[in-house]
Curated annotation (Swiss-Prot):
Highest taxon, organism lineage: Bacteria
Species annotation: Staphylococcus epidermidis (strain ATCC 35984 / DSM 28319 / BCRC 17069 / CCUG 31568 / BM 3577 / RP62A)
Gene (name only): gapA2
Stored CDD domains: GAPDH_I_C, GAPDH_I_N
Keyword Disulfide bond listed: no
Annotated catalysed reactions: D-glyceraldehyde 3-phosphate + phosphate + NAD(+) = (2R)-3-phospho-glyceroyl phosphate + NADH + H(+)
Protein name: Glyceraldehyde-3-phosphate dehydrogenase 2
Length: 341
């Protein structure tokens, strides 16, 4: 039985999630909630500067949009409690506005009749379970939680990388830097922002700023709590980022041993290893959470290791959102079947 999905928000992540979800036969996208007319949404789905022309035909219709004959209802209400999730039998709402990334706010979707909610960003509080595929998705608990967080794109990258290193060699401590493409949170031209560096034009500078990725990692990989810290460098590219991770390990290692650990990790679809000398644009629209740049792996003093991992911060992350939503839906179905017996 297909999982009924609704997407709240049609920004960068919302549109990428919709494109990907429509290729998943386990999911039935029934509705989107956005403040734009169907003509605008259809156009932005059909033509994307970063990820290219969509391979499906999206048309605006009176009730919303039609994608290759599949009709999706368009709603426009800024208050999630007013949305007809109960009437539409919505199993999972993918919350992609960024405005309800707190359990106490996201619960509005539950009050409207949705069974579960998946946040497309780290939770800012409340009763929310954070999930990173390849790290703790086997602990997804629909009996205890109604609201889930897919963490951030950077946590989805560093999570599997840190897990492999910690499981195989043990992490003593480390520092990470994400070299991150520009995002909607930055300014095209100098304008006020609570982070004075992010107030500066994103197209003109490398901008040092904060990231919560290393701190959030303890939520999904508690074994490394207190062992990792990090920062971000925002760079003037439109997409694709990387994590530069330097750790001290409990064991002495070689470059080959480190790269082999990633190659042999049971993380198909989540973590990949690239041996060619590629650059960021080559990873655009790559679906993995992390792609190890094997040529950049370094070892100093036998146990200090530097690893570079690429990630498409839009497409890779959105793939994980869809996969986690799919898993939540499957668990809902399994629970319903047990009750029916």
């Amino acid at each position: 039985m297909a999982t009924n999905i609704a997407i709240n928000g049609m920004g960068r992540i919302g549109r990428m999630v919709l494109r990907i979800a429509l290729n998943n036969k386990n999911l039935n996208v029934k509705a989107i909630n956005a403040s734009y007319p169907p003509e605008t949404i259809a156009h932005l789905l059909n033509y994307d500067t970063t990820h290219g022309v969509y391979d499906k035909k999206v048309e605006p219709i009176e009730s919303g949009i039609k994608v290759n004959g599949h009709e999706i209802k368009l709603l426009s209400d800024r208050n999630p409690e007013n949305l007809p999730w109960n009437e539409m039998d919505i199993d999972v709402v993918i919350e992609a506005t960024g405005k309800f990334n707190h359990g106490d706010k996201a619960v509005a979707h539950i009050n409207a009749g949705a069974k579960k909610v998946l946040l497309t960003g780290p939770s800012k509080g409340g009763d929310v379970q954070m999930i990173v595929k390849g790290v703790n998705d086997n602990q997804l608990d629909i009996d205890t939680y109604d609201i889930f967080s897919n963490a951030s794109c950077t946590t989805n990258c560093i999570g599997p990388v840190a897990k492999v290193l910690n499981d195989k060699f043990g992490i003593i401590n480390g520092l990470m830097t994400t070299v991150h493409a520009i995002t909607n949170d930055q300014k095209n031209i100098d304008n006020p922002h609570k982070d004075l560096r992010r107030a500066r034009s994103c197209n003109e500078s490398i901008i040092p700023t904060s990231t919560g990725a290393a701190k959030a990692l303890k939520e999904v990989l508690p074994e490394v709590e207190g062992k990792l810290h990090g920062m971000a460098l925002r760079v003037p590219t439109k997409n694709v980022s990387l994590v530069d991770l330097v750790v001290d390990l409990e064991q002495n290692v070689t470059v080959t041993q480190v790269n082999d650990a990633f190659k042999n990790a049971d993380l198909s679809g989540v973590l990949d290893v690239e041996e060619a000398p590629l650059v960021s644009v080559d990873f655009n629209t790559n679906p993995h959470s992390a792609i190890i740049d094997s040529q950049s792996t370094m070892v100093m003093g036998q146990n200090k290791v530097k690893v570079i991992a690429w990630y498409d911060n839009e497409w890779g992350y959105s793939n994980r959102v869809v996969e986690v939503a799919d898993k939540i839906g499957q668990l809902i179905d399994d629970k319903a079947m047990v009750k029916a017996i």
